[in-house]
């Protein structure tokens, strides 16, 4: 039996919400992102609240987060008083760049810890250095992927 496209759309939006929540974002922000990815068009602020069946306050918080991460952008439509939002250009590169920033913060913490380990603790230092190398490698790989996505 084939499923209704609206059913599939709803499940997709919910899945993106759950994935975003697992990454530390509000579930509503993920649901909004899923809606923008699926629909591919600008949506009025009030329509977001109606379509996702959440409060305008939740939409306001989520739009700020998604705008700060440069995943969506606010646009104006002639003759319309409310704000519209749409998927930003190259949002997936922006996602990767956000992850890279997080990895860089971890690297700083690891480096600070390394600086405090006495030189006579070579085994500990070696394990911590390997852990730092893991984060440097991930950061470099994600940076390259972001650059590749930007280049098209």
What does each model-found stretch correspond to?
Residues 22-23, 37-40:
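Short helix-capping/hinge SLiMs at alpha-helix to coil transitions
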Residues 23-28, 44, 77-97:
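Short, cationic-aromatic polyanion-contact patches
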Residues 116-152:
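C-terminal regulatory/oligomerization modules of transcriptional regulators
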